[in-house]
């Protein structure tokens, strides 16, 4: 099932930490979480890359207001799309390669695998503190492919799991936790998204789903609970109207404060060291088992 390669791609040589963002089911706001993690880390002065491997539903270009941008080929490989003049945040997505936003992607597993391999091996990421990989929901061909490509990569920091409070979403998260254990990816923590609704008029937060399921699941599986994120209509409007300027205005929002706290928990020195130790243990276990 897994690749027998023992070295990571040279294109990842300048990447310090690789983080997967996973969800058990669609519609839980995983790409929104990935976007805000990237914006928050970039605001903290980190160099961040976002790789969108949701091949049949790439949404990262739209979240960043970069749908009209294109990647181009250099002598070293594909150059990602940079969101700012300081080049602190860059993006790669199949959405940049489609001729039209409405184009559908109807690919079988082998072609998906080839595309992900090309993203990992042929993109000129340069020096990055974090590469965030936005994945499709569930455990599909894309997940298996990325696991194969990163199986022996030393920069794997771990996975952030996104869920919503509903029971059906929490049940699917258990599958993601099992997937991470099987492939040896440490869990950085669980985020409960859509935990309440923020009124755009009075800013009061009301629960429209149940609450606390993500935190309870984290306790059950002995994972870190990174926090709750409400539904904020102001952020939705901001994404719709940003036109490529999201990075400049996001820092003044209430969501930015929430994600600053989440990043402090997920990417604290203590949590990162613990994740790296877990990754080493899992790789040793895999080698012992002959995987």
Curated annotation (Swiss-Prot):
Binds 4 [4Fe-4S] clusters per heterotetramer. Contains two stable clusters in the N-termini of NBP35 and two labile, bridging clusters between subunits of the NBP35-CFD1 heterotetramer. It is found in: Cytoplasm. GO terms for biological process: iron-sulfur cluster assembly. GO terms for molecular function: 4 iron, 4 sulfur cluster binding; ATP binding; ATP-dependent FeS chaperone activity; iron-sulfur cluster binding; metal ion binding. Its cofactor is [4Fe-4S] cluster. It comes from the Eukaryota. Residues 276-285 have a biased composition (Basic and acidic residues). ATP binds at residues 24-31. GO terms for cellular component: cytosol. InterPro entries: Mrp-like_CS (IPR000808), Mrp/NBP35_ATP-bd (IPR019591), NUBP2/Cfd1_eukaryotes (IPR028600), P-loop_NTPase (IPR027417), YlxH/NBP35 (IPR033756). Gene3D superfamilies: P-loop containing nucleotide triphosphate hydrolases. It holds the Pfam family ParA. Residues 270-291 are annotated as: Disordered. Belongs to the Mrp/NBP35 ATP-binding proteins family. NUBP2/CFD1 subfamily. Heterotetramer of 2 NBP35 and 2 CFD1 chains. This is Cytosolic Fe-S cluster assembly factor CFD1. The gene is CFD1.
């Amino acid at each position: 099932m897994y690749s027998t390669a023992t070295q990571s791609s040279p294109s990842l040589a300048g990447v310090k930490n690789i983080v997967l963002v996973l969800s058990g089911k669609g519609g839980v706001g995983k790409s929104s979480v990935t976007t805000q993690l990237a914006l928050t880390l970039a605001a903290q002065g980190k160099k961040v890359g976002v790789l969108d491997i949701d091949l049949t539903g790439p949404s990262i270009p739209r979240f960043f207001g970069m749908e009209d941008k294109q990647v181009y080929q250099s002598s070293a490989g594909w150059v990602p799309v940079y969101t700012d003049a300081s080049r602190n945040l860059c993006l790669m997505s199949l959405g940049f390669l489609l001729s039209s936003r409405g184009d559908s992607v109807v690919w079988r597993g082998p072609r998906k695998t080839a595309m992900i391999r090309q993203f990992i091996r042929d993109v000129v990421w340069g020096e990055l503190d974090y590469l965030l990989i936005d994945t499709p929901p569930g455990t599909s061909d894309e997940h298996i492919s990325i696991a194969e490509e990163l199986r022996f990569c030393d920069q794997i920091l771990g996975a952030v799991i996104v869920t919503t409070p509903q029971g059906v979403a929490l049940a699917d998260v258990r599958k993601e936790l099992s997937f991470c254990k099987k492939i040896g990816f440490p869990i950085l923590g669980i985020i409960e998204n859509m935990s309440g609704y923020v009124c755009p008029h009075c800013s009061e937060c009301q629960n429209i789903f149940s609450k606390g399921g993500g935190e309870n699941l984290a306790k059950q599986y002995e994972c870190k609970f990174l926090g709750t994120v409400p539904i904020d209509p102001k952020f939705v409007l901001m994404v719709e109207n940003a036109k490529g300027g999201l990075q400049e205005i996001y820092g003044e929002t209430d969501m930015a404060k929430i994600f600053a706290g989440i990043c402090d928990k997920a990417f604290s020195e203590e949590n990162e060291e613990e994740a790296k130790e877990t990754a080493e243990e899992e790789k040793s276990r895999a080698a012992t088992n002959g995987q």
